[in-house]
């Protein structure tokens, strides 16, 4: 979490973001599944971050990506971020059309462990009802990135895209399995980023035009 905060702060202090800019967090997450009405409890979380803060977020027993009940490669746009340690909640504004399902995500400081499975369900019961149909997402960076980004961006300038890679079996995942799971999500994410670039270009033109009109008006007044 600290690494994510430091990365955002470093980038944004080296180049001050402009009103037309966007902060987009693209990362992986675990999907905490829960069958409503079945009395089933969900797996809880604890994790060990690896390579470049990429965020592998959960830990469970003996399943490959192909054997999981969740579908690896699903992409979600986060509409609500809940910080597990502090209980704080953050709401990125989703103003533009997109092709993704929207979900609520919990950001924790540790890996997802089955031993703690009774903790998350009661605490995030509302998230279970309002987020993905059978659970919610879990990562280790979204809330930190939001809080660091809030110094430079408005809520409408921040987007959080999460690709599901596991449901709690991160110890059994290899780099190749993760690569395969994420590969299918790339085209949709690329299209979304292209749309944001178009919006960014339009905003810059509008700002430039507005500045020109202000300058012209100032000259007339003088």
Positions of predicted regions on the chain:
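Glycine-rich phosphate- or other oxyanion-binding loops that anchor nucleotides, phosphorylated ligands
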Residues: 1-38, 61-222
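Acidic, Ala/Val/Gly-enriched low-complexity intrinsically disordered segments
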Residues: 45-54, 60, 65
């Amino acid at each position: 979490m600290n690494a994510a905060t430091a990365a955002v702060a470093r980038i944004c202090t080296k180049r001050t973001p402009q009103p037309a800019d966007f902060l987009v967090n693209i990362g992986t997450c675990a999907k905490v599944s829960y069958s409503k009405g079945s009395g089933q409890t969900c797996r809880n979380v604890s994790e060990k971050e690896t390579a470049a803060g990429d965020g592998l977020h959960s830990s469970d027993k003996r399943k490959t990506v192909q054997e999981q009940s969740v579908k690896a490669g699903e992409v979600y746009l986060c509409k609500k971020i809940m910080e597990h340690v502090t209980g704080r909640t953050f709401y990125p504004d989703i103003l533009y059309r997109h092709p993704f399902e929207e979900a609520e995500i919990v950001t924790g400081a540790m890996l997802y462990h089955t031993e703690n499975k009774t903790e998350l369900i009661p605490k995030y019961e509302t998230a279970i009802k309002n987020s993905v149909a059978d659970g919610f997402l879990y990562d280790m960076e979204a809330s930190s990135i939001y809080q660091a980004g809030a110094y430079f961006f408005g809520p409408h300038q921040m987007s959080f895209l999460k690709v599901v890679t596991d449901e709690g079996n991160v110890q059994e995942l290899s780099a190749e399995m993760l690569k395969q799971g994420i590969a299918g999500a790339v085209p949709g994410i690329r299209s979304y980023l292209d749309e944001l670039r178009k919006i960014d270009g339009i905003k810059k033109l509008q700002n430039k035009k507005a500045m020109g009109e202000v300058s012209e008006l100032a000259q007339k007044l003088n």
